[in-house]
Each structure stands twice: as structure tokens, then as C-alpha cells.
């Protein structure tokens, strides 16, 4: 009798074990993509960076590779942009591959890199064109291969572009020019150090500057000359201008690198007390220069946010979604009032220079 009872108990235990096992799935729980990093405290820093998009609930439909093409690999601005793109790749679960010409601003190299990316079978291309017209044939090749192209920072003037991610360069330049005219009290001789005249970025910024300068009768634009976004080029230009005529009141450079090169030439000539300088990027060194009194202003472009939003837009398109024709970010004047806020934001992303 005892053995019979024991047998019944054991059978009951076994049955309960089986039913308990059926209540648990043998498939592991779905792993979510890593969450986006917590946004820094609200400051004057780039809006797109502060409000970084949250990671998707599930991984993308396939293992996408997105090429991010910049104009050079050494300038801090482009390092920030690539960092934002890589951050998006981690958050959104896609592979991001950087392409940058060995020679800064080289159209030939960038064209070859687009062709290489097509051959490698990338799923999308985010590109900051070195030459807005010259890059069009390469973009058309990507179009023909069925690869969506997103323009970042600089517009392309042809081919099919899914969206442009970046600042409104002309409007931003107008705002910066207004600030500089205020610093001059509406009077003075001004020099513009342009970027690459073949790039739409440079064209738009020069247009923005000249729009405002021409509206102020007390302002004289004495020279507007390309420095190709290079510090040493800008320094040489300023050295030559100073030798010809040192009567300069302000320098408006189209990026921080050229602003700092211009300042160095002015400093060597003992003219920094008489001339105010502005840049365009809101990069770490530019912000530090503003706080040190070397520059009076720059323009926030939110490079980190540009890279992030470019990759995010590419993924949205690859997944069959739609994006705005122009994803606008950045556009605030960086001055002594908010430069430290920008430095704090860069530090939160691991950049101190």
C-alpha cells in the first residue's frame, strides 16, 4: 500500500514538472538595441545633440552598412561629425563606415570613394560633397545602383538626394554677420575669408555675409578671398593683406580653422587689439578661442548632431520610411555668453579639443 501511494505521488510530481516547463518559452527574450545616451542638461549647445533620438525597440530588418563620407579626416569638425554618425550606428544597430580623402577637399578622391563604396555594396551613403557640382556624376552612379544618398553639411547640386541634413548656411551667416556688425557699431572695413568656392556651403555663407554687410552703409567689404577651409591658407592670405593695407576692422572666416589662422597673422603683426575675428563651426578650439578673447564669435553647426541625424535618416529610408526634404539643425551664434556651454556639451561626448 505504501509503495502504491509513493508511486502515485511521484507521478503527480512529474506531471507538475512537465506543465511548469510548458509555461516557459525556450526562445531567449529579444535583445533591444542599446539605448541612446542620456541627453546632457539643457544648455545653448546643439539642439539635435541634446535631444538625441532614442534607439529603436527592435533591431533593423537586416544588417545594413552605411557609408559616411566627409571632406577630410584631420579637421576637428569632421571628427565630431563622424563621431555622431558612429554613435548613431551603435544606437540604431547599423554598421557605419567612414570615408575621407587623404588630401583634404579632394574631389578626385571623394569621387573614387563613392565608386569604391558602390563596389563594396553599402546600403546607403551619407556624403558631405567637396564640390557640390563635381560630385554629381558619382551620386548618379549611386542612384543607378539603387543606393540612397543623403547629403550632410553640404548640399549637392544634382543627382537624387533623399534629404539634406545640416544648417541653413545662408541664414546662419546672416545672423552671424548681424552680430559682427553690432560689435563694430555699424562701421568698419571687413575681410571675408571664404572656403572652397566650388562647395555650396561656401557659396551660401558668403551670400549670407554679403547680404547683411551690403545693408549697412558704414561697412566696407574690402576683400573676399578663398582660404579653402585651411588654417595655413587663411594665415597666408591675412599676412599678404596686412602687408598691402593693415587698415582692417573685422575678419569673417567661413570656419574656425581659418579664423584662427587669420588671428595668428594679426597677432604676429600686433593687430589683434584693433581687429575682431569670427569663425564658423562652434568647434572646441573655436569656443576656447572665444573665451580667450581671440575670436568674438562663431556659428554652431552641431557637427555631432549632423552625423547622427544623417545615419538615422538613412536607416529610416532603408526601412521604407519617409524623411523631410531638409533636416535642419544648428544655427545659433556662439559668443562669450554661451561658449562654455558648448565646451561642456563637447566634453560630454568625449571631446576636449
Model-derived regions, located:
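Positively charged n-region of N-terminal signal peptides that target proteins for export
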Residues: 1-10
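Hydrophobic core
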Residues: 10, 14-18
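A residue-level marker of the well-folded mature domains of exported/periplasmic proteins
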Residues: 18, 22-353
Amino acid at each position: 500500500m505504501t509503495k502504491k501511494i509513493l508511486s502515485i505521488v511521484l507521478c503527480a510530481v512529474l506531471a507538475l514538472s512537465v506543465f511548469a516547463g510548458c509555461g516557459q518559452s525556450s526562445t531567449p527574450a529579444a535583445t533591444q538595441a542599446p539605448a541612446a545616451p542620456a541627453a546632457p542638461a539643457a544648455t545653448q549647445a546643439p539642439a539635435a545633440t541634446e535631444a538625441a533620438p532614442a534607439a529603436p525597440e527592435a533591431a533593423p530588418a537586416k544588417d545594413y552598412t552605411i557609408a559616411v563620407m566627409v571632406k577630410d579626416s584631420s579637421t576637428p569638425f569632421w571628427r565630431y561629425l563622424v563621431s555622431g554618425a558612429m554613435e548613431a550606428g551603435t544606437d540604431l544597430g547599423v554598421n557605419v563606415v567612414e570615408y575621407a580623402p587623404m588630401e583634404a577637399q579632394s574631389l578626385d578622391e571623394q569621387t573614387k570613394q563613392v565608386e569604391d563604396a558602390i563596389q563594396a555594396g553599402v546600403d546607403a551613403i551619407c556624403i558631405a560633397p567637396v564640390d557640390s557640382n563635381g560630385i554629381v556624376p558619382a551620386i548618379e552612379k549611386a542612384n543607378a545602383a539603387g543606393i540612397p544618398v543623403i547629403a550632410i553639411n553640404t548640399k549637392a547640386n544634382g543627382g537624387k538626394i533623399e534629404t539634406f541634413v545640416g544648417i541653413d548656411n545662408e541664414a546662419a551667416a546672416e545672423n552671424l554677420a548681424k552680430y559682427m556688425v553690432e560689435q563694430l557699431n555699424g562701421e568698419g572695413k571687413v575681410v571675408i575669408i571664404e572656403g572652397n568656392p566650388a562647395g555650396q556651403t561656401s557659396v551660401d555663407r558668403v551670400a549670407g555675409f554679403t547680404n547683411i554687410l551690403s545693408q549697412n552703409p558704414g561697412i566696407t567689404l574690402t576683400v573676399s578671398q578663398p582660404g579653402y577651409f585651411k588654417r595655413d591658407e587663411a594665415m597666408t592670405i591675412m599676412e599678404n593683406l596686412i602687408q598691402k593695407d593693415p587698415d582692417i576692422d573685422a575678419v569673417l572666416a567661413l570656419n574656425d580653422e581659418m579664423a584662427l589662422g587669420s588671428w595668428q597673422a594679426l597677432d604676429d603683426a600686433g593687430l589683434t587689439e584693433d581687429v575682431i575675428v569670427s569663425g564658423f563651426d562652434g568647434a572646441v578650439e573655436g569656443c576656447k578661442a572665444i573665451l580667450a578673447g581671440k575670436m568674438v564669435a562663431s556659428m554652431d553647426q552641431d557637427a555631432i548632431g549632423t552625423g547622427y541625424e544623417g545615419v538615422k535618416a538613412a536607416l529610416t529610408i532603408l526601412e521604407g520610411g519617409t524623411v523631410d526634404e531638409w533636416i535642419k539643425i544648428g544655427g545659433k551664434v556662439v559668443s562669450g555668453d554661451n561658449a562654455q556651454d558648448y565646451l561642456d556639451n563637447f566634453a560630454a561626448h568625449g571631446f576636449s579639443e
